[in-house]
Structure formats: structure tokens, C-alpha cells
Swiss-Prot record:
GO molecular-function term, one example from the UniProt record: RNA binding
UniProt cross-references to InterPro entries, sorted A to Z: APO_dom (IPR023342)
Entry keyword annotation includes Plastid: yes
GO CC annotation, single: chloroplast
Pfam families membership: APO_RNA-bind (PF05634)
Compositional bias ranges of the Basic and acidic residues kind: 106-115
Main location group: plastid
Organism expressing this protein natively: Arabidopsis thaliana (Mouse-ear cress)
Gene (name only): APO2
Protein name: APO protein 2, chloroplastic
């Protein structure tokens, strides 16, 4: 019996035919794990989702001839994946949906609604809160507090380095050797970083937005930019989603608004309604721990458990915020990181990005994505914390991950499946530069 290797295809690559033969392979030998290495595959691919399919040829052969079986190997999950593109200061962020598709959908919507009675606006467009998303808003708020409190404790046992000249950070006992510093006097240091201690704001980007008492009210003017408080963008999204915080009150309507124009409305009369009774929150709100109460984990088991809880809080916050963004619109400037939680952006002329003079400092508002609201700080993934240091010549073999994920991974947490491709956990790293030059 001979098996002919017909094609091997991974996600994003077209199949290629490379014929070779394996003689006298029985079913038991074929299912043996050692056969995986005799096919010429890397040992790192053994844990991947690889599908083997054997196809018999339809032609009849003589009794003395051996029948050839084409072997097709397919991988549903990519072995490695590039990070999202990082745009320079001179580039504008692309629209999540192309503007041509938006215009086409708008024309189709006007055509379908022609000569039809207007439907009542659903929440939150009618000024009311989506009641089914209120528990989710509380869950996202508490997940953010748990994430911050746990990171304070983990950063006492997992070293996080920050460059003193730029905003780059590195998770590990010492900084990486790559020449990627873009701060002042970088030419004198030849692009090398000067690593110092980091704080929690280096890991979680402190992205703030204006707090709106009425999300359907008038837009914030330029002269009001200092009189309106600013809160973390995720917190503002949770407040508009139904979270009650005494320091940041919000207007809660009990009747839908009455539209009198495209951009004009009046509030419905609520005088005949009884006074609302104060209701307890679905879950109690957590608070951030003071600095004096932050203690490192006492044992290795506690460190691993804390890392798992931190990673779970990170995933809950991102997944819940993504669901809230589907109902409560979030706007982002296409030129700078400014975020506004609301149906339309504010009018504050504080954009200092590329060619802001031509726009008189006004922001170019567009729909935001999850990474605009919760930007992940990508850092280099250290394959072995206790092993040899990272080499500058092997930079293309190392992967990257969000700083929170890398901290939890070095603390002992299991890396989620959707981060393994960018971290390149299944890519073999050469031990030396000479071995890397031998890689085809």
C-alpha cells in the first residue's frame, strides 16, 4: 500500500501538490502519533485542528499494483496571524463600513419606507434605556473594577517595564532589545529603549469621554469643554446603559420622546405618572482598592487563580462592551484617539492631529469599533521567562499579545484560543541566528 501526499492547505494559502509515497502503512500505524512526524510536519502543529481526508482513486488497478491514496491536510486555524495595522499620524482611520455601502443602504432604506407610516423609535433612540441590557452594563462596570484591582496585585509579582522616552511597554524581568523607540533623542540612543518602572495606566490606556446628563440633548459646544466632567469611556457607556452612579447622574425618561422634526423633539408629559421608587441595583457596584490595601499574592496557586480571574474579567469587559456598542452608539475621531459616547460627536475644537488647522481643530467623527473604546496595548510575547533573553535578530519569530493577556500568561493563566495565532505559540523559535538562516 502507498499513500500519495496530494495537498496541504492552511487558512489563507492555496493548496500545493507535493507527491511523495509512504509504503506499507497499516491503519494502526497511520493513526500512531509517530506517523505525524514521518510526514514531515513540525511537532508544533500536532495540537492544531488538522483534518485528514483520504480519497480513493476510481480507476481499477492490477493486483500487483498498489493503490495510491491522496492525503489532504487542512488547518482551520491559522498558525500565525499579523496584528491589526497601526496607522501613522498622517493616516486617517478607515470607516468600519465603507461610505459607499452606507449610502447604498440609506437609499435602500428610504426606498423601502416610502409611502409607509412611520414606526415608533425603539430604545435607546426614543430616550429610554434598554432594560434587557441593564444587567449587562452592571456586569461590564464590575468587570472593569475587578480587572484594575487584580492588575494592581499581579504587577507586584510580574515585572512590567516602561520606556522613559516613548509609550512602549514590555512584560518580563527585563526589557526587550529591539530598536523601536520613537521618543525624543532617539537617534542618539540608536533607537534603544531606556526601561523604567511602570504603572497601571501604562497597561490600561486611560481613555476618557465627556459625561452626558442627557444623551439626546444638545451637543457640547467648544466653550463648554471645561465645564462638563470627563469619565472613563467604558464607564460612560455603562452609565448610558443603565448603571446608576451618584457622582454622575443621568436623565432617565419613563416615556418615549415626541419627534417634531428630524433633529427636534420634546419630552412627553410624565406628571400623571407616580413618583418612581428607588430600586436597588441588580448587583452591588464594586470599588477600586486604595493603594494601602493592595497586596501581592501569597503563593503560586493564588497567583495562577488571580491571573485566571483577571483574564476572565478582561474578556467579560470586552465582550459586554461590544454588545452595548451595538445599541448605544460610540463615535471616534478619524484623526486622533478622542472618543465620544453618544449619537453624535461633540463640537469641542481640541483635535491636534495631522492637518487640524484645516479643520479648525474639529474632530472627524465616525463609528467606533471595540479597539477604539478599549485599546489593547500590544507587547512582545516572551516564549520562556526563565529561559535565554530575546534576540534582536530573531524578531520575526516572536509574537505579540495585549499587555493584560501577556501579564496573565506569565502569571500562569491559560491563553485563550483566539490569542494563540498572534502570540505565535505554535511557531518554533530557533535557538541561534545560524539556525534561523537554515529555515526555508
Amino acid at each position: 500500500m502507498s499513500i500519495t501526499y496530494s495537498a496541504i492547505s492552511f487558512s489563507g494559502f492555496s493548496p500545493k501538490s507535493v507527491p511523495f509515497a509512504i509504503h506499507s502503512v497499516t491503519r494502526r500505524q497511520f493513526l500512531n502519533p509517530n506517523t505525524f512526524y514521518r510526514f514531515g510536519f513540525s511537532p508544533s502543529l500536532q495540537g492544531s485542528s488538522i483534518e485528514f481526508s483520504l480519497q480513493l482513486n476510481s480507476r481499477v488497478v492490477l493486483s500487483k499494483e498498489r493503490r495510491s491514496l491522496p492525503l489532504v491536510v487542512r488547518n482551520d486555524r491559522p498558525q500565525n496571524e499579523d496584528l491589526p495595522k497601526q496607522y501613522t499620524r498622517r493616516e486617517k482611520k478607515p470607516f468600519p463600513v465603507p461610505i459607499v455601502d452606507l449610502r447604498r443602504a440609506a437609499r435602500e432604506r428610504v426606498k423601502n419606507n416610502k409611502d409607509k407610516p412611520k414606526r415608533p423609535l425603539p430604545p435607546p433612540k426614543n430616550g429610554m434605556v434598554v432594560k434587557s441590557l441593564v444587567p449587562l452594563a452592571y456586569k461590564v462596570y464590575n468587570a472593569r473594577i475587578r480587572l484594575i484591582n487584580n492588575l494592581h496585585r499581579l504587577m507586584k509579582v510580574v515585572r512590567v517595564n516602561a520606556c522613559g522616552w516613548c509609550n512602549e511597554i514590555h512584560v518580563g524581568p527585563y526589557g526587550h532589545p529591539f530598536k523601536s523607540c520613537k521618543g525624543p533623542n532617539t537617534s542618539q540612543r540608536k533607537g534603544l529603549h531606556e526601561w523604567t518602572n511602570s504603572v497601571i495606566e501604562d497597561v490600561i490606556v486611560p481613555l476618557e469621554a465627556y459625561h452626558l446628563f442627557d444623551r439626546l440633548g444638545k451637543r457640547i459646544r467648544h466653550d463648554e469643554r471645561f465645564s462638563i466632567p470627563r469619565v472613563p469611556a467604558v464607564v460612560e457607556l455603562c452609565i448610558q446603559g443603565g448603571v446608576e452612579i451618584p457622582e454622575f447622574p443621568a436623565k432617565r425618561r419613563r416615556k418615549p420622546i415626541i419627534r417634531i422634526g428630524k433633529s427636534e423633539f420634546v419630552d412627553a408629559d410624565e406628571t400623571e405618572l407616580p413618583d418612581p421608587e428607588p430600586q436597588p441595583p441588580p448587583v452591588p457596584l464594586l470599588t477600586e482598592l486604595p493603594v494601602s490595601e493592595i497586596t501581592p499574592p501569597s503563593s503560586e496557586e493564588e497567583t495562577v487563580s488571580l491571573a485566571e480571574e483577571t483574564l476572565q474579567a478582561w474578556e467579560e469587559m470586552r465582550a459586554g462592551a461590544k454588545k452595548l456598542m451595538r445599541m448605544y452608539r460610540v463615535r471616534v475621531c478619524g484623526y486622533c484617539p478622542e472618543v465620544h459616547v453618544g449619537p453624535t460627536g461633540h463640537k469641542a475644537q481640541n483635535c491636534g492631529a495631522f492637518k487640524h488647522q484645516q479643520r479648525n481643530g474639529q474632530h472627524g467623527w465616525q463609528s467606533a469599533v471595540l479597539d477604539d473604546l478599549i485599546p489593547p496595548r500590544y507587547v512582545w510575547h516572551v516564549p520562556d521567562v526563565n529561559g535565554p533573553p530575546m534576540q534582536r535578530e530573531l524578531r520575526s519569530f516572536y509574537g505579540q499579545a495585549p499587555a493584560v493577556v501577556e501579564i496573565c500568561a506569565q502569571a500562569g493563566a491559560v491563553v485563550p484560543e483566539h490569542y494563540r495565532a498572534t502570540m505565535r505559540l505554535e511557531v518554533g523559535i530557533p535557538s541561534s541566528v545560524k539556525e534561523a538562516e537554515m529555515v526555508v
